């Protein structure tokens, strides 16, 4: 099992540390990867610590909505672009940006498989969504600009370039003949 925690302006891949103390008003994403019988699953959720500002609360809530509508957009024989189009529209409608450098991914015997699931784009584009595919929907939504930077020291943690807050929710989804099934929540 792998754990990552991303606080405030950390977009993803935050490294847990006993030296970091959460404080009143922080938002934190906890991302957990599990392996069962050689198959991977991935899920994350946001937590709000103490008295969170209305702006931070709205970002967390809208990001969850983005994930949910992204999952609802998945249809057998649809396209990966269908997911990104609805996520991007919902985020922009609320004044947020969508991280474009990172996204969801196929999951199976390997942690990251095809397809790359962009959380922006156009409907009816990208890879065909075939029953039996397993992928993550994990929009990373920023309060500021979409641009991100890699931590030069640990070369793993990714931050918003402008220091703005970022939120992420994630579920692992199986595409079935009739719709979807959530495998990791």
Predicted regions and their residues:
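Active-site neighborhoods and metal-handling regions in enzymes and metal-associated proteins
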Residues: 1-185
């Amino acid at each position: 099992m792998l754990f990552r925690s991303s606080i405030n302006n950390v977009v993803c891949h935050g490294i847990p540390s006993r030296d970091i103390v959460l404080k009143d008003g922080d938002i934190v994403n906890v991302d957990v990867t599990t392996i069962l019988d050689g198959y991977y699953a991935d899920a994350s959720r946001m937590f709000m610590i103490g008295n969170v500002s209305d702006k931070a609360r709205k970002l967390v809530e809208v990001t969850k909505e983005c994930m949910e509508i992204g999952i609802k957009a998945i249809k057998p024989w649809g396209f990966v672009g269908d997911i990104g189009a609805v996520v991007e529209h919902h985020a922009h409608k609320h004044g947020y940006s969508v991280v474009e450098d990172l996204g969801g991914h196929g999951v199976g015997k390997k942690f990251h498989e095809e397809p790359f699931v962009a959380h922006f784009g156009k409907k009816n584009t990208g890879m065909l969504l075939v029953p039996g595919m397993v992928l993550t929907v994990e929009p990373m939504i920023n309060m500021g600009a979409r641009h991100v930077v890699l931590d030069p020291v640990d070369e793993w943690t990714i931050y918003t370039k402008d220091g703005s807050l970022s939120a992420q929710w994630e579920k692992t989804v199986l595409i079935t003949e009739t719709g979807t099934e959530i495998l990791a929540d």
